[in-house]
């Protein structure tokens, strides 16, 4: 169960915006209607909440920022402008709605009244059963199970339809709210400084169906408080909802940028379920040169990364099936000491290549590395020669098929050795691929490195790669490449 905390105040425009969502529920009165037929009851309700000093500010709960957040089994901690605290618990699967209130208990009845009027404005009847224009009364008001279920269902439907974008129009007078929505709920410090605010802008599409952040913010960071909910794009600084981010293969919804993935996630999307067999999982570094930095000993640093990632080293190797085709695969993990290549990484990859050579298996190595590991000195540099030697026997002597996949970043000794030795070299979109980094080149040669000159698209034009393949297409492309080179599925059900 997750707990979300909100502390905000919505203006009339924001509440009009959230009421505008009721179009999907066939609301008879639309706030944006220009024919003069706006719903007077809604306007009165807005005016009453904005002007009243004693109101409970229900809009804190049901405003635009929260309407997208009604996910199963969540607790909302709400504070109104009067300092009252409310704990609202939703469990959609088990159909539970509970409210814990500090102080005035009238909040519950006010909440029910609002939800009822919001839910079915086109089905309103007075107590005597005759039709009326009184939108505060609803036939489902006292059927709370019906009200909650329908309201929450509509919220989730809108949420999924927009894929966590903010729907509908935002008026010019609510620009300040638009900015504060991001800063209050997601960003650290509860707001942006003056410099950031000047470069911040919000645009909506012609039909008002998307909410985009334009501009880049160097100091626009997600606070640790909300890091479990959102992932910020490194390219456009847009926010991606974490629950759906893995299903989207860590591709930014705003700009399509490919963010970093862990080795386990890459194995999951490439290898058929139930076919993964890891190799050499117990192989760990023994600190061969007894490297000690001023910050912490090398072995302590290794231990901390092992606890952080759940891995023993910066690469996972093993055997599996890709669409029924048996393969040997190694996947580097940048989260483990920057994917640096030490003696253990070199030994695991060498053993993997030798196993593939003896078993006549196609080979895939997914590269994500900052290069050789400086804490192991020349031993890490020797891994380049050792892996290249094993690769030569695999490719030149045995005539087997090796596919190298370069992800961001692939630099240093990995680029200079097995990363660029594949029979087919595939790069991910926007991947940063280089031998020496931009800063190192500029400081060494005193020359400016052009922007984008070390990205996959530019290098592809220069002939360094064979393909640039997005993640969602990668498994299918690899399967076709293997079949083209004579490797077919063991299971006939995979053969089309």
UniProtKB/Swiss-Prot annotation:
Catalytic activity: N(6)-carboxybiotinyl-L-lysyl-[protein] + acetyl-CoA = N(6)-biotinyl-L-lysyl-[protein] + malonyl-CoA
Name listed for the protein in its UniProt record: Acetyl-coenzyme A carboxylase carboxyl transferase subunit beta, chloroplastic
Annotated localization: Plastid, Chloroplast stroma
Organism listed in the record: Ranunculus macranthus (Large buttercup)
Cofactor note: Binds 1 zinc ion per subunit.
Chain ranges of zinc fingers (C4-type): 233-255
Ranges where the CoA carboxyltransferase N-terminal domain occurs: 229-496
SUPFAM superfamilies documented for this protein: ClpP/crotonase
Known EC number: 2.1.3.15
Family of this protein: Belongs to the AccD/PCCB family.
Function: Component of the acetyl coenzyme A carboxylase (ACC) complex. Biotin carboxylase (BC) catalyzes the carboxylation of biotin on its carrier protein (BCCP) and then the CO(2) group is transferred by the transcarboxylase to acetyl-CoA to form malonyl-CoA.
Any one Pfam family match given in the protein's UniProt record, by short name: Carboxyl_trans
């Amino acid at each position: 169960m997750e707990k979300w905390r909100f502390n905000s105040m919505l203006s009339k425009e924001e509440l009009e915006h959230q009421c505008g969502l009721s179009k999907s529920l066939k609301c008879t009165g639309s706030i944006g209607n220009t024919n003069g037929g706006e719903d007077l009851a809604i306007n009165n309700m807005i005016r009453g909440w904005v002007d009243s000093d004693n109101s409970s500010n229900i809009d804190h709960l049901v405003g635009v920022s929260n309407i997208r957040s009604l996910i199963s089994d969540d607790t909302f901690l709400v504070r109104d402008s009067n300092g009252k605290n409310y704990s609202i618990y939703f469990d959609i699967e088990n159909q539970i709605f509970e409210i814990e209130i500090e102080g005035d208990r009238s909040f519950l009845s006010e909440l029910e009244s609002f939800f009822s009027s919001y839910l079915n404005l086109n089905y309103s009847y007075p107590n005597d059963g005759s039709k009326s224009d009184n939108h505060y009364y609803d036939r489902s008001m006292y059927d709370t199970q019906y009200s909650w279920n329908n309201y929450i269902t509509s919220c989730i439907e809108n949420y999924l339809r927009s894929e966590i974008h903010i729907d509908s129009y935002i008026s010019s007078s609510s620009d300040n709210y638009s900015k504060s929505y991001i800063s209050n709920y997601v960003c650290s410090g509860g707001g942006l400084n003056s410099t950031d605010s000047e470069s911040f802008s919000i645009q909506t599409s012609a039909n008002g169906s998307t909410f985009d952040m334009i501009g880049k913010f160097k100091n626009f960071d997600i606070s640790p408080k909300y890091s479990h909910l959102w992932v910020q794009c490194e390219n456009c600084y847009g926010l991606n909802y974490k629950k759906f981010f893995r299903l989207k293969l860590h591709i930014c919804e705003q700009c399509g940028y490919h963010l970093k993935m862990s080795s386990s996630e890459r194995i999951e999307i490439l290898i058929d379920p139930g076919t993964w067999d890891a190799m050499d999982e117990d192989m760990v570094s023994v600190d061969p040169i007894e490297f000690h930095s001023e910050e912490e000993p090398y072995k302590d640093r290794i231990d901390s990364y092992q606890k952080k990632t759940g891995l023993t080293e910066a690469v996972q190797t093993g055997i599996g099936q890709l669409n029924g085709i048996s393969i040997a695969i190694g996947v580097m993990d940048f989260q483990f000491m920057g994917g640096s290549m030490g003696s253990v990484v070199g030994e695991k990859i060498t053993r993997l290549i030798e196993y593939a050579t003896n078993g006549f298996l196609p080979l895939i190595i997914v590269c994500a590395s900052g290069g050789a590991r400086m804490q192991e000195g020349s031993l890490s540099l020797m891994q380049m020669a050792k892996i290249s030697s094993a690769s030569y026997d695999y490719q030149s002597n045995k005539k087997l098929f090796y596919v190298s996949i370069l992800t961001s970043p692939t630099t240093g000794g990995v680029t200079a050795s097995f990363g660029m030795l594949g029979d087919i070299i595939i790069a991910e979109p926007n991947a940063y691929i280089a031998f020496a980094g931009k800063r190192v080149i500029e400081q060494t040669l005193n020359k400016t490195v052009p922007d984008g000159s070390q990205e996959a698209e530019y290098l592809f034009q220069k002939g360094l790669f064979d393909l640039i393949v997005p993640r969602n297409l990668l498994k299918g492309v690899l399967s076709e490449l293997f079949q083209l080179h004579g490797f077919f599925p063991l299971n006939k059900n995979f053969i089309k």
